[in-house]
Regions:
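Charged, solvent-exposed alpha-helical segments that act as regulatory interaction surfaces
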Residues: 95-98, 362, 445
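Amphipathic repeat-derived elements
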Residues: 41-47, 55-60, 393-401, 408, ...
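Positively charged, low-complexity intrinsically disordered regions
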Residues: 109-111, 127, 433, 439, ...
Length: 454
């Protein structure tokens, strides 16, 4: 590892230089406020005649795929933002909406810092962002009608475009200010420096990364670029889509049924890392397992297994909004898909859990006990089933009925009394909606997941 102070603009410069934002990095997410602050700092640099402005650190590592290509481990937000600023400056000069004392300034910036005109089309840009951002960036080099308006890159490019038009600085002053941005460049060596450990230390506060971000970095970061892209496309991106991008919660549920305890949401990354290392997991096999469970997660959330009876119960459980039971449902449905329990046992198990949840809700039993119950319920059931060489469903029912204290299963008498005494219109809205669904559709032959009740 080698660190040195240098001008930020030097990272974009040079023959065959191309900066790669690895697929494990999050999308570009600097806000307009961040861009405003940068531009204000550049104005201040010139107005106060300062020699330079410190702009943070950048961590980069040469890739195995190509000479001159560097992978940006940390600092992609700053690098991308300044690239957008230079592109906005170039386009305004080329459109002759602003002028420069140097008639070649636009071309000089374009060929030195933005594009390598000698490279093939797919490698021409000196910056390669992650998948969706890359498409947006390429369109910014085209006409405005081609811009990807939903992209944050486009929004910030437009901000710079308009801000430059205000001419607080001339084109020459702005470029001079950009050249004064200083960074600490930390260069890592393949095979010698652990990029993951360095990234962790730089982001130890965890303020700007979700637990899922950190897990994604962990599983992808130390892989060659082509392997990263393959793992991202074949597994991680599918996991994101299947979980509706709520990957941190999904990972917590995955860990819960594997660890048989509920990790704190802010500790999901650390728990995942320990789990992976303890089991000496092959990364691709681990991602494949996660992707498979993410498909089950999607089917649970959407009540879309394709089996009508199963989907009806899942739909009702979704009405109750009891996400706490997912650490039980995920391995249960997986067990069924592996033909380790039959369809009858699956339906029966789902209905037993449904009854358990609704009875407790009607009797106003505390919900804080449910986390621990469902963290271990599947493993408890499997253990007793194997020990007694008996069926899954009777064992599951036995475990729930014999829970004690705050975890117990309400008796018939308790449930009936609560049902008689409860003010239905004052109860939990999800439980009320569930109750109306059951009363109205008890014998309904047509199943629809989009029913609504007022």
């Amino acid at each position: 590892m080698k660190g040195s102070e240098k001008r930020l603009i030097s990272l974009y410069d040079g023959s065959n230089v191309r900066m790669i934002i690895p697929v494990y990095q999050r999308n570009y997410d600097w806000t307009r406020d961040n861009c405003r602050q940068l531009f204000d700092d550049l104005v201040s640099l010139i107005k106060n005649n300062r020699q330079n402005h410190f702009f943070g650190s950048v961590v980069e590592m040469g890739t195995q795929e190509g000479i001159g290509e560097v992978s940006i481990i940390d600092g992609q937000q700053r690098i991308t933002t300044v690239y957008l600023l230079m592109l906005a400056l170039v386009k305004l000069l080329e459109e002759e909406k602003i002028t420069s004392a140097d008639p070649q300034l636009a071309r000089r910036i374009r060929v030195s810092y933005l594009e390598d005109e000698f490279q093939p089309e797919d490698k021409k840009l000196r910056l390669k962002p992650v998948k969706n951002d890359e498409m947006a960036l390429k369109r910014l080099f085209k006409d405005e009608k081609d811009y990807l308006l939903s992209s944050n890159l486009t929004n910030n490019f437009r901000y710079f475009y308009e801000r430059i038009l205000d001419q607080e600085l001339t084109a020459d002053e702005l470029f001079k200010a950009i050249q004064k941005l200083m960074i600490i460049d930390i260069s890592l060596k393949q095979g010698e420096d652990d990029a993951q450990l360095i990234f962790e230390s730089l982001n130890s506060t965890g303020l700007d990364l979700t637990e899922a971000d950190k897990v994604r970095n962990y599983v992808l970061m130390n892989q060659p670029v082509k392997v990263q892209e393959s793992l991202y496309e074949n597994y991680w991106n599918k996991i994101e889509v299947n979980t509706n991008y709520e990957v941190s919660n999904f990972l917590r549920n995955y860990l819960t049924f594997n660890l048989k305890r509920v990790p704190k949401i802010q500790k999901v990354y650390l728990e995942f890392k320990k789990y992976s290392e303890k089991n000496d997991s092959d990364i691709e096999e681990l991602l494949s397992d996660l992707e498979r469970y993410s498909e089950i997660n999607r089917d649970i959330s959407n009540a879309s297994t394709g089996e009508r009876e199963v989907d009806e119960v899942l739909h009702r459980l979704n009405i109750l909004d009891m996400r706490v039971i997912k650490p039980f449902l995920l391995p249960l449905i997986n067990y069924w898909k592996l033909n380790k329990i039959d369809f009858k046992a699956l339906i029966g198990s789902l209905k037993v859990v449904e009854t358990f949840i609704f009875r407790r809700t009607m009797c106003s039993f505390p919900t804080n006990a449910l986390n621990k119950i469902f963290a271990t319920l599947f493993s408890e059931t499997i253990k007793l089933t194997n020990q007694g060489n008996t069926e899954f469903l009777p064992v599951l029912s036995y475990i729930l009925i014999n829970k004690a204290d705050s975890s117990r299963y309400p008796k018939d008498s308790e449930f009936l009394k609560s049902f008689d005494d409860k003010d239905i219109y004052d109860m939990n809205k999800n439980a009320r909606k569930y109750l109306f669904d059951r009363l109205e559709n008890r014998n309904c032959q047509i199943f629809c997941v989009n029913r609504s009740f007022s």
